[in-house]
Amino acid sequence: MHESLDKRLEGLLTGLALAGRSLDLEGKRQELSILEEQTLKEDFWQDVTSAGKVSERIVSLKRQIAHYEEFKVRVENLAFFLNDGDVSADPELREDLEKEFTICEHILSEWETQRLLSGEVDKNPCFLTINAGAGGTESCDWVEMLFRMYCRWAAQHQWKVEVIDRQEGDVAGIKHVTVKFSGDYAYGYAKAERGVHRLVRISPFDSNAKRHTSFASVDVYPEIDDEIEIDIRPNDLRIDTFRSSGAGGQHVNVTDSAVRITHIPTGIMVSCQRERSQIQNRESCMKMLRARMYQQILQERLEKQLLDRKNKKEIAWGSQIRNYVFQPYTLVKDVRTGHETGNVQAMMDGELLDDFVKAYLAEYGEIS
Protein backbone atom coordinates (compact mmCIF):
# COMPACT_ATOMS: atom_id res chain seq x y z
CA MET A 1 0.00 0.00 0.00
CA HIS A 2 1.29 3.45 -0.81
CA GLU A 3 -1.72 5.53 0.16
CA SER A 4 0.45 7.88 2.28
CA LEU A 5 2.71 8.54 -0.73
CA ASP A 6 -0.34 9.23 -2.87
CA LYS A 7 -1.42 11.93 -0.41
CA ARG A 8 2.06 13.42 -0.36
CA LEU A 9 2.08 13.47 -4.17
CA GLU A 10 -1.28 15.23 -4.16
CA GLY A 11 0.19 17.85 -1.83
CA LEU A 12 3.19 18.35 -4.10
CA LEU A 13 1.05 18.70 -7.22
CA THR A 14 -1.15 21.28 -5.49
CA GLY A 15 1.93 23.12 -4.25
CA LEU A 16 3.49 23.02 -7.71
CA ALA A 17 0.44 24.71 -9.23
CA LEU A 18 0.35 27.37 -6.49
CA ALA A 19 4.08 28.00 -6.82
CA GLY A 20 3.79 28.46 -10.57
CA ARG A 21 1.16 31.15 -10.08
CA SER A 22 2.81 32.91 -7.14
CA LEU A 23 6.22 32.97 -8.85
CA ASP A 24 4.63 34.53 -11.96
CA LEU A 25 6.79 32.43 -14.27
CA GLU A 26 5.28 33.85 -17.43
CA GLY A 27 6.05 37.36 -16.25
CA LYS A 28 9.60 36.33 -15.38
CA ARG A 29 10.12 34.78 -18.82
CA GLN A 30 8.90 37.97 -20.51
CA GLU A 31 11.16 40.12 -18.32
CA LEU A 32 14.11 37.83 -19.09
CA SER A 33 13.49 38.14 -22.82
CA ILE A 34 13.37 41.95 -22.63
CA LEU A 35 16.55 42.16 -20.56
CA GLU A 36 18.44 39.78 -22.85
CA GLU A 37 17.49 41.97 -25.82
CA GLN A 38 18.98 44.96 -23.97
CA THR A 39 22.33 43.18 -23.63
CA LEU A 40 22.57 42.91 -27.42
CA LYS A 41 22.54 46.69 -27.90
CA GLU A 42 25.87 48.29 -28.83
CA ASP A 43 25.72 50.86 -26.02
CA PHE A 44 24.74 48.34 -23.32
CA TRP A 45 28.06 48.54 -21.46
CA GLN A 46 28.41 52.33 -21.67
CA ASP A 47 26.74 52.56 -18.26
CA VAL A 48 28.67 49.87 -16.37
CA THR A 49 26.60 50.18 -13.18
CA SER A 50 23.29 49.79 -15.00
CA ALA A 51 24.64 46.96 -17.15
CA GLY A 52 25.84 45.16 -14.04
CA LYS A 53 22.40 45.36 -12.44
CA VAL A 54 20.76 44.05 -15.62
CA SER A 55 23.23 41.16 -15.77
CA GLU A 56 22.59 40.28 -12.12
CA ARG A 57 18.84 40.34 -12.73
CA ILE A 58 19.22 38.03 -15.74
CA VAL A 59 21.17 35.53 -13.64
CA SER A 60 18.52 35.71 -10.91
CA LEU A 61 15.62 35.20 -13.34
CA LYS A 62 17.33 32.26 -15.05
CA ARG A 63 18.02 30.67 -11.67
CA GLN A 64 14.41 31.05 -10.50
CA ILE A 65 12.96 29.67 -13.75
CA ALA A 66 15.41 26.76 -13.85
CA HIS A 67 14.71 25.98 -10.19
CA TYR A 68 10.99 25.71 -10.89
CA GLU A 69 11.47 23.61 -14.03
CA GLU A 70 13.78 21.20 -12.19
CA PHE A 71 11.25 20.90 -9.37
CA LYS A 72 8.46 20.23 -11.86
CA VAL A 73 10.46 17.39 -13.45
CA ARG A 74 11.16 15.86 -10.03
CA VAL A 75 7.46 15.88 -9.12
CA GLU A 76 6.51 14.40 -12.51
CA ASN A 77 9.09 11.65 -12.01
CA LEU A 78 7.63 10.88 -8.58
CA ALA A 79 4.17 10.60 -10.12
CA PHE A 80 5.50 8.27 -12.83
CA PHE A 81 7.23 5.87 -10.43
CA LEU A 82 4.33 5.94 -7.99
CA ASN A 83 1.80 5.09 -10.70
CA ASP A 84 3.87 2.61 -12.72
CA GLY A 85 6.17 1.08 -10.10
CA ASP A 86 5.24 -1.66 -7.64
CA VAL A 87 6.11 0.31 -4.52
CA SER A 88 4.64 -2.17 -2.04
CA ALA A 89 6.72 -5.04 -3.48
CA ASP A 90 9.97 -3.09 -3.77
CA PRO A 91 11.23 -1.73 -0.41
CA GLU A 92 14.29 -0.17 -2.05
CA LEU A 93 12.12 1.78 -4.50
CA ARG A 94 9.91 2.97 -1.66
CA GLU A 95 12.95 4.16 0.32
CA ASP A 96 14.24 6.11 -2.70
CA LEU A 97 10.81 7.66 -3.24
CA GLU A 98 10.57 8.63 0.44
CA LYS A 99 13.89 10.48 0.19
CA GLU A 100 12.84 12.27 -3.00
CA PHE A 101 9.49 13.25 -1.47
CA THR A 102 11.31 14.78 1.51
CA ILE A 103 13.58 16.83 -0.79
CA CYS A 104 10.64 18.08 -2.88
CA GLU A 105 8.62 18.98 0.21
CA HIS A 106 11.58 20.99 1.51
CA ILE A 107 11.80 22.91 -1.79
CA LEU A 108 8.07 23.60 -1.64
CA SER A 109 8.44 24.83 1.95
CA GLU A 110 11.07 27.33 0.78
CA TRP A 111 8.68 28.73 -1.82
CA GLU A 112 5.88 28.98 0.72
CA THR A 113 8.23 31.00 2.92
CA GLN A 114 9.04 33.32 0.02
CA ARG A 115 5.32 34.01 -0.40
CA LEU A 116 5.54 35.77 2.98
CA LEU A 117 8.30 37.99 1.62
CA SER A 118 6.13 40.42 -0.29
CA GLY A 119 7.70 43.67 0.94
CA GLU A 120 8.97 46.12 -1.64
CA VAL A 121 12.62 45.45 -0.74
CA ASP A 122 12.44 41.84 0.52
CA LYS A 123 14.09 40.61 -2.71
CA ASN A 124 16.99 43.05 -2.38
CA PRO A 125 20.57 42.49 -1.25
CA CYS A 126 21.22 43.64 2.30
CA PHE A 127 23.84 44.84 4.74
CA LEU A 128 24.17 43.00 8.05
CA THR A 129 26.10 44.65 10.87
CA ILE A 130 27.18 42.98 14.13
CA ASN A 131 28.46 45.01 17.08
CA ALA A 132 29.96 43.73 20.32
CA GLY A 133 28.11 44.65 23.49
CA ALA A 134 29.51 45.12 26.97
CA GLY A 135 31.88 42.33 27.93
CA GLY A 136 35.17 43.07 26.21
CA THR A 137 36.91 40.05 24.72
CA GLU A 138 33.94 37.77 25.47
CA SER A 139 31.58 39.87 23.37
CA CYS A 140 34.13 40.27 20.58
CA ASP A 141 34.50 36.50 20.40
CA TRP A 142 30.70 36.22 20.30
CA VAL A 143 30.57 38.63 17.34
CA GLU A 144 33.05 36.44 15.46
CA MET A 145 30.96 33.34 16.18
CA LEU A 146 27.80 35.04 14.87
CA PHE A 147 29.69 36.32 11.83
CA ARG A 148 30.79 32.77 11.02
CA MET A 149 27.21 31.50 11.48
CA TYR A 150 25.76 34.10 9.11
CA CYS A 151 28.42 33.53 6.44
CA ARG A 152 27.75 29.78 6.46
CA TRP A 153 24.01 30.43 6.32
CA ALA A 154 24.49 32.80 3.36
CA ALA A 155 26.55 30.15 1.55
CA GLN A 156 23.66 27.69 1.92
CA HIS A 157 21.43 30.24 0.17
CA GLN A 158 24.11 30.75 -2.50
CA TRP A 159 24.36 34.45 -1.70
CA LYS A 160 27.46 36.44 -2.54
CA VAL A 161 29.23 37.57 0.65
CA GLU A 162 31.32 40.77 0.83
CA VAL A 163 32.93 42.10 4.01
CA ILE A 164 32.47 45.88 3.87
CA ASP A 165 33.95 46.92 7.20
CA ARG A 166 35.64 45.03 10.02
CA GLN A 167 37.28 46.07 13.28
CA GLU A 168 39.25 43.42 15.16
CA GLY A 169 39.00 42.95 18.91
CA ASP A 170 41.87 44.07 21.13
CA VAL A 171 42.64 40.50 22.26
CA ALA A 172 40.50 38.20 20.12
CA GLY A 173 37.37 38.22 18.02
CA ILE A 174 35.73 41.15 16.24
CA LYS A 175 34.43 44.43 17.69
CA HIS A 176 32.36 45.36 14.65
CA VAL A 177 31.71 43.90 11.22
CA THR A 178 29.47 44.85 8.30
CA VAL A 179 28.86 42.31 5.56
CA LYS A 180 26.82 42.54 2.38
CA PHE A 181 24.68 39.61 1.22
CA SER A 182 23.68 39.63 -2.47
CA GLY A 183 21.16 37.09 -3.68
CA ASP A 184 17.47 36.28 -3.94
CA TYR A 185 15.47 37.49 -0.92
CA ALA A 186 18.60 38.27 1.11
CA TYR A 187 16.94 41.13 3.01
CA GLY A 188 13.65 39.28 3.38
CA TYR A 189 15.34 36.43 5.22
CA ALA A 190 18.01 38.38 7.11
CA LYS A 191 15.65 41.02 8.54
CA ALA A 192 14.49 38.41 11.06
CA GLU A 193 17.92 38.64 12.74
CA ARG A 194 17.69 42.29 13.78
CA GLY A 195 18.08 42.66 17.54
CA VAL A 196 20.27 41.63 20.49
CA HIS A 197 21.70 38.10 20.66
CA ARG A 198 22.67 36.76 24.12
CA LEU A 199 25.25 34.03 24.76
CA VAL A 200 25.71 32.06 28.00
CA ARG A 201 28.75 29.77 28.23
CA ILE A 202 31.83 28.84 30.23
CA SER A 203 34.40 31.32 29.01
CA PRO A 204 37.49 29.96 27.20
CA PHE A 205 39.21 33.18 28.32
CA ASP A 206 38.56 32.61 32.05
CA SER A 207 41.08 30.39 33.84
CA ASN A 208 38.51 29.83 36.60
CA ALA A 209 36.06 28.34 34.06
CA LYS A 210 33.18 30.54 35.18
CA ARG A 211 30.01 31.09 33.22
CA HIS A 212 29.85 34.37 31.32
CA THR A 213 27.03 36.19 29.55
CA SER A 214 27.85 38.08 26.36
CA PHE A 215 25.76 40.29 24.10
CA ALA A 216 25.98 41.33 20.45
CA SER A 217 23.59 43.49 18.46
CA VAL A 218 22.66 42.74 14.87
CA ASP A 219 21.25 45.30 12.46
CA VAL A 220 20.01 44.56 8.94
CA TYR A 221 19.11 47.06 6.25
CA PRO A 222 18.30 46.63 2.53
CA GLU A 223 20.37 47.91 -0.35
CA ILE A 224 18.20 50.24 -2.41
CA ASP A 225 18.56 51.50 -5.95
CA ASP A 226 18.62 55.11 -7.08
CA GLU A 227 14.93 55.04 -8.02
CA ILE A 228 14.02 55.24 -4.32
CA GLU A 229 14.48 58.86 -3.29
CA ILE A 230 16.24 59.51 0.01
CA ASP A 231 16.85 63.16 0.91
CA ILE A 232 20.46 63.49 2.03
CA ARG A 233 21.87 67.02 2.07
CA PRO A 234 25.66 67.38 1.78
CA ASN A 235 25.66 69.92 4.63
CA ASP A 236 24.23 67.24 6.94
CA LEU A 237 27.23 64.96 6.46
CA ARG A 238 30.50 64.75 8.33
CA ILE A 239 33.11 62.79 6.38
CA ASP A 240 36.21 61.42 8.10
CA THR A 241 39.07 59.44 6.60
CA PHE A 242 41.38 57.06 8.42
CA ARG A 243 43.84 54.28 7.75
CA SER A 244 42.48 50.82 7.10
CA SER A 245 43.00 48.28 9.85
CA GLY A 246 43.83 44.67 9.15
CA ALA A 247 46.38 41.92 9.38
CA GLY A 248 48.91 43.82 7.31
CA GLY A 249 50.00 43.81 3.70
CA GLN A 250 51.05 46.18 0.98
CA HIS A 251 47.86 48.25 0.97
CA VAL A 252 47.08 48.29 4.70
CA ASN A 253 47.86 51.34 6.90
CA VAL A 254 49.65 53.13 4.07
CA THR A 255 47.10 55.81 3.11
CA ASP A 256 43.96 57.23 4.68
CA SER A 257 41.72 55.32 2.27
CA ALA A 258 39.05 54.19 4.75
CA VAL A 259 36.00 56.45 5.04
CA ARG A 260 33.49 57.13 7.82
CA ILE A 261 30.36 59.18 7.12
CA THR A 262 28.09 60.52 9.86
CA HIS A 263 24.61 61.85 9.12
CA ILE A 264 24.47 64.61 11.74
CA PRO A 265 20.64 65.02 12.10
CA THR A 266 20.07 61.31 12.80
CA GLY A 267 23.44 60.29 14.21
CA ILE A 268 23.67 57.40 11.73
CA MET A 269 27.30 56.48 11.12
CA VAL A 270 28.66 54.15 8.43
CA SER A 271 32.21 53.24 7.49
CA CYS A 272 33.98 51.27 4.78
CA GLN A 273 37.59 50.18 4.38
CA ARG A 274 37.08 47.35 1.90
CA GLU A 275 38.15 49.22 -1.23
CA ARG A 276 41.67 50.46 -1.92
CA SER A 277 40.66 53.97 -2.92
CA GLN A 278 39.01 56.63 -0.81
CA ILE A 279 36.54 57.40 -3.61
CA GLN A 280 35.31 53.80 -3.79
CA ASN A 281 34.97 53.58 -0.02
CA ARG A 282 33.01 56.82 0.00
CA GLU A 283 30.62 55.47 -2.64
CA SER A 284 30.09 52.32 -0.57
CA CYS A 285 29.45 54.44 2.53
CA MET A 286 26.80 56.48 0.72
CA LYS A 287 25.04 53.27 -0.36
CA MET A 288 24.99 52.06 3.23
CA LEU A 289 23.82 55.44 4.52
CA ARG A 290 20.91 55.51 2.07
CA ALA A 291 20.06 51.95 3.09
CA ARG A 292 20.15 52.81 6.82
CA MET A 293 17.93 55.85 6.32
CA TYR A 294 15.48 53.84 4.24
CA GLN A 295 15.40 51.23 7.00
CA GLN A 296 14.28 53.98 9.37
CA ILE A 297 11.37 54.73 7.04
CA LEU A 298 10.42 51.04 7.01
CA GLN A 299 10.61 50.89 10.80
CA GLU A 300 8.31 53.91 11.16
CA ARG A 301 5.79 52.24 8.85
CA LEU A 302 6.02 49.05 10.89
CA GLU A 303 5.41 50.87 14.16
CA LYS A 304 2.33 52.53 12.65
CA GLN A 305 1.03 49.14 11.46
CA LEU A 306 1.52 47.73 14.94
CA LEU A 307 -0.39 50.59 16.51
CA ASP A 308 -3.23 50.05 14.04
CA ARG A 309 -3.57 46.37 14.95
CA LYS A 310 -6.10 45.32 17.58
CA ASN A 311 -3.84 42.50 18.77
CA LYS A 312 -0.54 44.30 18.90
CA LYS A 313 2.58 42.12 18.63
CA GLU A 314 5.66 43.28 20.45
CA ILE A 315 8.63 43.95 18.20
CA ALA A 316 11.46 46.08 19.51
CA TRP A 317 14.48 46.04 17.22
CA GLY A 318 16.84 47.09 19.99
CA SER A 319 15.67 44.37 22.36
CA GLN A 320 16.93 40.85 23.01
CA ILE A 321 15.57 38.43 20.42
CA ARG A 322 17.42 35.16 21.02
CA ASN A 323 19.29 33.28 23.75
CA TYR A 324 22.15 30.87 23.03
CA VAL A 325 23.00 28.70 26.05
CA PHE A 326 26.08 26.46 25.73
CA GLN A 327 26.51 25.53 29.42
CA PRO A 328 25.26 24.04 31.74
CA TYR A 329 22.84 22.77 29.07
CA THR A 330 22.51 23.40 25.35
CA LEU A 331 19.59 25.45 24.05
CA VAL A 332 18.97 28.15 21.47
CA LYS A 333 15.59 29.82 21.95
CA ASP A 334 13.96 32.73 20.14
CA VAL A 335 12.28 35.12 22.57
CA ARG A 336 9.77 36.36 19.97
CA THR A 337 8.44 33.09 18.59
CA GLY A 338 9.40 30.48 21.18
CA HIS A 339 11.13 28.40 18.51
CA GLU A 340 14.06 26.47 19.97
CA THR A 341 16.67 23.78 19.38
CA GLY A 342 19.11 21.89 21.57
CA ASN A 343 21.57 21.34 18.72
CA VAL A 344 23.74 24.42 19.24
CA GLN A 345 26.55 23.12 17.00
CA ALA A 346 24.26 22.81 13.97
CA MET A 347 22.81 26.22 14.80
CA MET A 348 26.23 27.89 14.92
CA ASP A 349 27.11 26.16 11.64
CA GLY A 350 24.16 28.00 10.07
CA GLU A 351 22.27 24.77 9.38
CA LEU A 352 19.22 25.49 11.58
CA LEU A 353 18.97 29.26 11.20
CA ASP A 354 16.35 28.98 8.45
CA ASP A 355 14.00 27.25 10.90
CA PHE A 356 14.19 30.27 13.23
CA VAL A 357 13.73 32.69 10.33
CA LYS A 358 10.68 30.80 9.05
CA ALA A 359 9.14 30.79 12.52
CA TYR A 360 9.63 34.55 12.67
CA LEU A 361 8.13 35.11 9.22
CA ALA A 362 5.13 32.93 10.04
CA GLU A 363 4.53 35.08 13.12
CA TYR A 364 5.45 38.53 11.85
CA GLY A 365 5.85 38.26 8.07
CA GLU A 366 2.61 40.09 7.34
CA ILE A 367 3.76 43.21 9.18
CA SER A 368 7.55 43.20 8.84
From Swiss-Prot:
GO CC annotation terms, alphabetical: cytoplasm
Pfam families cross-referenced by the UniProt entry: PCRF, RF-1
Xref: PROSITE patterns: RF_PROK_I
Lineage top rank: taxon: Bacteria
MF terms (GO), sorted A to Z: translation release factor activity, codon specific
Matches recorded under Gene3D superfamilies: 3.30.160.20, 3.30.70.1660, Release factor
SUPFAM superfamilies (UniProt xref): Release factor
UniProt function note: Peptide chain release factor 2 directs the termination of translation in response to the peptide chain termination codons UGA and UAA.
Membership in a protein family: Belongs to the prokaryotic/mitochondrial release factor family.
Protein name (Swiss-Prot/TrEMBL): Peptide chain release factor 2
Name of the gene: prfB
